[in-house]
Amino acid sequence: MTNITTVADRYTAVWNESDAQLRRRAVAELWAHDGVEYVEGARFDRLDELVARIAHAHAEFVGSGTYRAAHAGDLRRHGDAVSFTIRLITSTVGEIAWAARVFLILDAEGRIREDYQLTIQPLADR
């Protein structure tokens, strides 16, 4: 059985990874080949779309040095379903700027088959 702390740590690390090649490799290792992410009414299918979506979010939020991604440690599991809160933390003062509840459905190998992000604390106007 997959360790959910490892899943949450690896998931969070993907959003913080600044090297595009390492980030792509991490996405390929974490998501199933037919993995999908649903966020804010959008759907991102398979590796190329997932990599592009994460690269865009990284450039906008983390790559600028304004924020870093972190999970809250509130990990839960039921069978192949895993949930936890992911947050954007301000780099300067460590405040929570945004948060979402993540629900993951894992495949038999422990890779993400489905990823749902539901915003619970919207990002304030910048």
Predicted regions and their residues:
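A solvent-exposed, acidic/Ser-Thr-rich amphipathic alpha-helical stretch
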Residues: 24-80
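A beta-strand edge to alpha-helix "cap/lid" segment located at domain peripheries
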Residues: 55-126
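Alpha-helix boundary/capping and short turn/kink residues
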Residues: 17-20, 40, 44, 94
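Short acidic-aromatic low-complexity motifs
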Residues: 2-33
